[in-house]
Structures are given as C-alpha cells and as structure tokens.
C-alpha cells in the first residue's frame, strides 16, 4: 500500500466520522434511547464509567440503521453502482428505519450526504477509500474503547445541545 492510499483512507475516514457523528448527534441520538435495546446499552456504558448520552448514541447506532449504517452502505453502493447506488442505499436505510420502528431520518440523510461527498470528491478520493474509512470510523466509536468513546460523544452532544 502506498503512502498516497493511506492518506486517502485517513481523509475518507475523517470525513465519514464527521458525517455520521454530526448527523446522528443533530438528529438527537444522544438525547434518549430511540429504539429497543439502546437504553440497555447506554446504561451499561454508564455503569463502566462512560457518558450516558454517549452510551445512548452508541446504543442507537447498534439497534437501528442511523447515519453510521447509512454512510457505510452508501459508500459500498457508490463503489458498486456509482451515484445511483448511493440513492438505493438511502432508500434501503429508510426502509430499515421503518422496520425498526425508528421515526428518524438520520440514516437516510447520512446516506445522501456521503453520496454527495463521494460524488464531489470522486476524482480525488474514490468510493473504495470511503468504505475502509467508514469501517475505521465505526471502530473508533464501537470497537475501540466504549468508555472514552462515550465521553467524547457526550461532549459533542453537549456542544450541539443534544445531551447533558
């Protein structure tokens, strides 16, 4: 792997991270558990010393297709089919939200915004880098360190008036 590819992955990862964290926070994922299971996850994260609002955020993205799922699915579909694939991904995420009884639109918006970003940046950073970048972005929130990730998400939520 060349250094240029590594830089593209890092840039795509940062863009994906900002896309899904800011959209999910704006749509209120840290405020309360929006779907079944999110409350339990939030409380378990609080119990290990994490932030409850950050825990709700993490629980909501595990239990329903929010902007993290929308960003990843749209990145994959853009890679496979081009911009049309991104629109199909947005539709699939919207359907997934309805199946989960999730009243929100964060996942659909996340899919649409990353589709636009990939379309605009495609001459410089291809969709395949956004797939890898999004996997890494999700790992920083869900797979690395729950306590500290929840604290960071809680601070972002507080700055955006979406949590305590």
UniProtKB/Swiss-Prot annotation:
Keyword Cytoplasm (UniProt): no
Main location: membrane
Annotated compartments: Cell membrane
Membrane topology according to the record: Multi-pass membrane protein
GO cellular component: plasma membrane
Superkingdom per UniProt: Archaea
Transmembrane intervals: 3-23, 76-96, 105-125, 126-146
Annotated InterPro entries: Prd_NiFe_hyd_3_EhaB
Protein keywords: Cell membrane, Membrane, Transmembrane, Transmembrane helix
UniProt entry tagged with the keyword Ion transport: no
Full protein name: Uncharacterized protein MJ0527
